[in-house]
Regions:
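N-terminal small-residue-enriched
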Residues: 1-144
Length: 144
């Protein structure tokens, strides 16, 4: 309904008028799903095995370190029921599994395909994906 959309847009605009500074504090925050998806997308890029192997990730030396608040857990679940990218194997035929990327705020793993795993001296995590005309590369499946 165009009228309803207009009303919601006006309400959002009015709420942003007359901003004011607030004192610094530790407070709980609720993020819009789009913002959360963006944060997870940036995390996925930062823990991508290719970037780690090239030395270009800002999380290069963060394995085992707290990179989020202690109550944050991010899981990549390639077997999630009705997940858009659910599959038993990655694009290179490597079996995949549900894996904690972030557990209690701590970085637990890189996402790797065979190539990046070989470059890092590690095993593939079964996270290779590919497009129709591209080589495989590391990618998350269904991050939650």
């Amino acid at each position: 309904d165009p009228v309803d959309i207009g009303k919601k847009a006006a309400e959002k605009t009015l709420r942003r008028l007359n901003p004011r500074k607030v004192k610094s504090a530790h407070v709980p925050v609720i993020l819009d799903p789009r913002v959360s998806a963006s944060i997870v997308g940036h995390l996925s890029g930062a823990i991508n095995g290719s970037g780690i192997a090239r030395g270009t990730s800002f999380l290069l030396d963060a394995m085992g370190s707290e990179v989020f608040a202690p109550h944050i857990n991010i899981i990549d679940d390639p077997h999630r029921k009705r997940g858009l990218r659910s599959k038993p194997f990655d694009a290179e035929g490597v079996a995949n599994q549900k894996r904690h990327l972030i557990e209690n705020g701590v970085l637990k793993t890189w996402i790797m395909d065979l190539r990046s795993a070989r470059q890092l001296g590690l095993k593939s995590t079964g996270n290779a994906s590919r497009g129709a005309g591209s080589l495989p590369g590391p990618s998350t499946t269904n991050p939650i």
